[in-house]
Amino acid sequence: MYAQTNLSIGRPARLVLLAVAALTVALTLLAAVGTHAARAEGPGEGTPWVVTLGDSYISGEAGRWAGNTNESSSWIDALGEKAYDDNAGHTAELIPGCHRSQSAEAYIGGGVDGENLACSGAETSSFTEEEKFKPGLDFYNSGGHEGQALMLEKFAKTHNVKLVPISIGGNNFKFAEVVQTCVEDFLFSPEWWPDYCSEEESVMENFSAGNVSTQQAAIKGAILNVAKAMSNAGYTSTQYTILVQNYPSPIPNGEGFRYSQKGYTRQEVGGCGLWNHDANEANATMLPTIDNAVFKAAEEAKLTNLKTMNISSAFNGRRLCEKGVGLLEEEGLTSWKGTGAVNKTEWINQIRTVSALFGSYELQEDLHPNYWAQLALRNCVTQAYNSGTPKGGACTISGEGLNAAGEPNMTLK
């Protein structure tokens, strides 16, 4: 006969089991809450984000420098040698040469986070040149490289993207090569027999009706890729806004230069070696052609959630070599932090030839909006974000000094 086994559980043991059961339930609930919280970041939910796409005029190229000088580069070094290091530890670039600076317009603050996916040198389509990958506004995916539209799609799935500012098209028109030709013509032809880049076939073919039509279609396709990326990520058109911006004038008209076109002072001192005639043509024909193509492409995309931001005159009064501003040494300054520096110095980086390149400067920074200009554009984007109800308009300087966020005063209207 087997002994009877007592299967009853005493009070202390019951309390232990109840405690274990309660802990199990609590952990299960926490896991569920954690899962819910993780899923809360995405289309229409969570912290709002601004994600910028495009080329050097939005990535933050030249953002390291605040003004220009022919003295020590330390006078204008606002961000230091880590200016373009955009990995998590700020020790290297995620894509070499993209130059995504910390002063870029993506980071508007005020409870809105920013992500900068733009890349200097980018065109509408991805490509590799001299072993450097340049992601376009497409879904390229090969060899570990991705297009910006694909990057956006992946990012937007797990973040609440509310505004997508875009700057694209300038490189499609080979504007950097155009500028190079203009500077070479200034340096290598005499004032009494000048070669004008604006009269060279290799330059003007970029602005021909046929090429304008081709590039306008490419820009439209890039914009539609952005909309497709957001749709693929689970967004409706009412949950985000695309903000297409055009390009600013970086130089004044010929009569607005503070250096004569006679001799070499204009380039050797000012870093703005263009003939008056070419400067006039750049502002009257070349840049308006690009800007019109960008905005017409935006219109043809027929997206109900698209706004435009006109920055063509955003830097007027602070442009490279423009009268009314100067190099730091010309304005009696020895630091970009000096009193009134933002009002007295240029917002466009000098054009540096190889022979004039020294210190930490890089050629790809030439003729780009610098630290002050990028903070100004950030102010413009903040106003375009409009506390979550995005709007478009034209952005221009509204006064001297800085706002509470340390940005130049600008008005979007």
Describe each PLM feature range.
Residues 2-23, 47, 362:
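N-terminal export and membrane-targeting signals
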Residues 27-45:
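C-terminal region of N-terminal signal peptides and the immediate post-cleavage residues
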Residues 56-60, 119-125, 170-175, 248-252, ...:
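Solvent-exposed loop/turn segments at secondary-structure junctions
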